[in-house]
Amino acid sequence: MEADGAGEQMRPLLTRGPDEEAVVDLGKTSSTVNTKFEKEELESHRAVYVGVHVPFSKESRRRHRHRGHKHHHRRRKDKDSDKEDGRESPSYDTPSQRVQFILGTEDDDEEHIPHDLFTEMDELCYRDGEEYEWKETARWLKFEEDVEDGGDRWSKPYVATLSLHSLFELRSCILNGTVMLDMRASTLDEIADMVLDNMIASGQLDDSIRENVREALLKRHHHQNEKRFTSRIPLVRSFADIGKKHSDPHLLERNGEGLSASRHSLRTGLSASNLSLRGESPLSLLLSHLLPSSRAGTPAGSRCTTPVPTPQNSPPSSPSLSRLTSRSSQQTQPQAPEVLVSPDRDDIPRVVIHPPEEDIEALKGQEQKNEENTDFTPGILASPQSAPGNLDSSKSGEVKGNGSGGSRENSTVDFSKVDMNFMRKIPTGAEASNVLVGEVDFLERPIIAFVRLAPAVLLSGLTEVPVPTRFLFLLLGPAGKAPQYHEIGRSIATLMTDEIFHDVAYKAKDRNDLLSGIDEFLDQVTVLPPGEWDPSIRIEPPKSVPSQEKRKIPAFPNGSAPVSADPPKEADHHAGPELQRTGRLFGGLILDIKRKAPFFLSDFKDALSLQCLASILFLYCACMSPVITFGGLLGEATEGRISAIESLFGASLTGIAYSLFAGQPLTILGSTGPVLVFEKILFKFCRDYHLSYLSLRTSIGLWTSFLCIVLVATDASSLVCYITRFTEEAFAALICIIFIYEALEKLFHLGEIYAFNMHNNLDALTSYTCVCAEPSNPSNETVELWERKNVTAASISWANLTVSECKTFHGMFVGSACGPHGPYVPDVLFWCVVLFFTTFFLSSFLKQFKTKRYFPTKVRSTISDFAVFLTIVIMVAIDYLVGIPSPKLHVPEKFEPTDPSRGWIISPLGDNPWWTLLIAAVPALLCTILIFMDQQITAVIINRKEHKLKKGAGYHLDLLMVAVMLGVCSIMGLPWFVAATVLSISHVNSLKVESECSAPGEQPKFLGIREQRVTGLMIFILMGLSVFMTSVLKFIPMPVLYGVFLYMGVSSLKGIQFFDRIKLFGMPAKHQPDLIYLRYVPLWKVHVFTVVQLTCLVLLWVIKASAAAVVFPMMVLALVFVRKLMDLCFTKRELSWLDDLMPESKKKKEDDKKKKEKEEAERMLQGDGDTVHLPFERGSLLQIPVKTLKYSPEKPVSVTINFEDEPSKKYMDAETSL
């Protein structure tokens, strides 16, 4: 019985059928102006001409525009003829098809273009037990936030859970309630009057209680944030400033009236600068260029006119309200909108808008020419969208007021009460949706209204934040059912945040469209059993919101389902134009230059960010240590021919040139292990055969440079498309593991130098000694050293020597406190371990600080960007304060060659025989493969689609720069540098850009990488200047740099699918994450794929760690062939999920053919919306009127045309299917 009663209450007095159209409101004044319309004009005015939406494919669908009823008037007989032509409104079997049709239509105006929505729900309640007021109880930007019952605070954002019953009740409300679409009103008073008039006319509301309902609707709105701002000093803030950050740029240009038209109205209308120029009392102005206007009326297409009060459309104006006139507002010129001026009052903020600087002179001149003076009379401060410019220009457009100056909450904007922190989270151009629900004692049955305003209007005081209101939902009912009304309000608010219903609400033409949107939403709803889920539990927002595109894709024209249910995958990383073979000499290089040249200046402008400074400091510290370490190892291997200073100079020179001119400046160059192995083998060969090492190395380097340039000329970089994820991840994982291994190895190596004494006897600590003594069996080298220093063993006071002096004279340490390399050094090793792991964990913690709950967002973001640099500074300071002598970074202090016998220019021949110039081509071939593979695999990893790079890649240009600088370094006797995988990945990770404007509860979206050249350029410039910064760099402990290596290696492993698949070996199936490839590939095949990849990784590790490391690039190349063999064990569908499909020449041709056919199909559909053009033989073109096409969801469109072949006078038939 209770349910029946509730249903009876929901049923209005005057029932209406579901086929009845919603009221398309023509504005407040349409009911008051005595304008007579013919019956046929009224019918044609409401007619909507629907173009049939014919889907050709999922990617490209022809959309027919709705013809606006304002411009096309047709008689009823025209509609009958349309039916005879076969242009019928399509029938839809499901709400989903109806919704897809609605979303597939486009409108000529901007009033139905969807915007982001902020939804607020207010409930009518008592305040202090005395009077009613609307109190904000919930809001939605992306997820729901509620005002907590027990405290004045907002809840955490959560996923809204709705009861199914409330959704059905909402559907009943839309079905039986008042629906008014495209209402033109400027104040809440006008909206209330029009809604109530419609309710009375339809019998939903009794005229006797009209004033009671109107009074309830116009009650004050109390927002949650107002208490926090009561004690704050009012802010003096201009609308222009607000508009820069939070308003829609299209708001100024809505319906064809742009900023230029507004400036024209400034010049021809009233002069807004009079006040400031004449020095009058400060007043608050709203200029015409902030007022969105509607279409029509004027030659420019705008309808912003100076309203003229008439007895028919406005009550008596208050003394404080006057209208502003100018000479330009009388005849045919566009009339300036009425500008209302507020008095100098304390409770209204002063908002002063200054005209653009370029218009000041024009305004001054116009002011002198004006013959009529404009009088400014204090009045109400109108909101930007509540001015009468929103009303129809063909009708009266008077600001609604009353004797007391109108409703203040609807006419003033107090920015001192605006929560600007929340305002920043609202996207640009957002509009508001207000939900008003409540219970009153004078109603016997609920009244419901759904209103869509056109255009959106800023109703001050109605919404928590000053954004224009687009939708209003009203539900007032008798007392006793407040929870029911609350749930219905939550339902409509949640629906407005749904991506599909949100678009339907903007594009709906009648009530049925809204009902279809609700039905489609119900089709997608998941119901949880009440006994298995507690609805009071708040669901945390997901990290990533699933895409709703599948709900927008219509079924195939013949009603069949797609062949595969697999979700669409993004294009492979090698599908871009950068790796397509041109067939011309240096063709790929020329295209790279053309592609990157337009971005050259922006590569420097885009670096104006604090994030780039953090990246420079981080990567500088990260690059310094491996370069110096590599130089030291190279110095040991070549007996000082090439050492640390050459390594620093070579890295700086190569890095600067590469950062300036390379195709992908995000890549960081560095030294590699195979290059070091090659240098060792080459030096040993030259020493055994008495050849000049530097000269032979120069010859090999020049040959390598030449061969790399040949690869550039022949577009060999296009072969990179055969390097799939399988090869990339094996190579990247190996480099990351090497970084981790070498960081730990260096830490253990410190244990050999700074050994610690084990198994100590604490009682015998006072007897532990370690002194220097004469070596018992001095070597020949030691004797020669003594002779050079003119000393003998007997003349040296061994017991009095310091540790360094004892090592200089090759003394021997004797005593119980002595280790293998000297006395035990207390605490150094353990302190190094503390520095090492503290650096790693602190860097990781600070990098993730962006997601913590402490401090403002800007502070967290800055700490995250400077994470590694802050860690280094903190650890250096702690090390300095503790004072334990940990090993420090050693940088050469002089800029000169390590070997005094060599210079900065090396001859390719030198003392070597002439034939060495020719034989050098053989090892150069091996070096070419090494350089090519290292460079291009790293480039492929950097240019992956996951990084969302927008400026394109430049594989050919990258290889050219590496080749040129390799030749330069060879001539100068400097080490060779190539792309460093881990450093490049760390560089990219440090420049990730995420969305700043995110709704509460929504995770920031990854937008891409800050692509620029400055970070790499500054890193290598600082590296070259390091020789002059030794006084600062000498304080950096080496364990801290080793900890940075560990952090880079571990952080670079994130996102590698290979390691995610390795984790699956130890997980039961029920605990495995919902990885996409596990849905489509059997688990045992995933394990087989992982085992093969792991085996290849182990083989690469063994080869790289052995003396055969010089053939390491050949083994990386072999991975491509291993991947090709996997086609025999896996299907292409499985490999498409586990890896990228290998490119095939036949597949490319077929793909090109499909693309060409698609372009042809799109070209056929170009032109006006009433004709389809089909090419025919001998250049003929068939034109088919769209109205002859009949669409049925069960079968494809088929058109048969008879036409005459002119030359042969024969009749032919042509048939096409769409």
Curated annotation (Swiss-Prot):
One of its GO terms (molecular function) is solute:inorganic anion antiporter activity. Glycans are attached at N176, N274, N410, N780, N790, N800. SUPFAM superfamilies: Phoshotransferase/anion transport protein. It comes from the Eukaryota. The keyword Translocase does not apply. One of its GO terms (biological process) is camera-type eye photoreceptor cell differentiation. GO terms for cellular component: apical plasma membrane; basolateral plasma membrane; cytoplasm; cytoplasmic vesicle; membrane; plasma membrane; stereocilium. Residues 634-641, 721-729, 843-865, 934-958, 1037-1038, 1118-1218 are cytoplasmic. Keywords: Cell membrane, Cell projection, Disulfide bond, Glycoprotein, Ion transport, Membrane, Phosphoprotein, Sodium, Sodium transport, Symport, Transmembrane, Transmembrane helix, Transport. Residues 1012-1135 are annotated as: Essential for cell membrane localization and transport activity. Expressed in aorta, ventricles, atrium, mesenteric artery, kidney, spleen, duodenum, jejunum, ileum, colon, lung, trachea, gastric fundus and pylorus, cerebrum, cerebellum, pancreas, liver, parotid gland, and epididymis. Expressed in the inner ear by cochlear outer and inner hair cells (at protein level). Highly expressed in testis and spleen. It is a multi-pass membrane protein. This is Sodium bicarbonate cotransporter 3. The gene is Slc4a7.
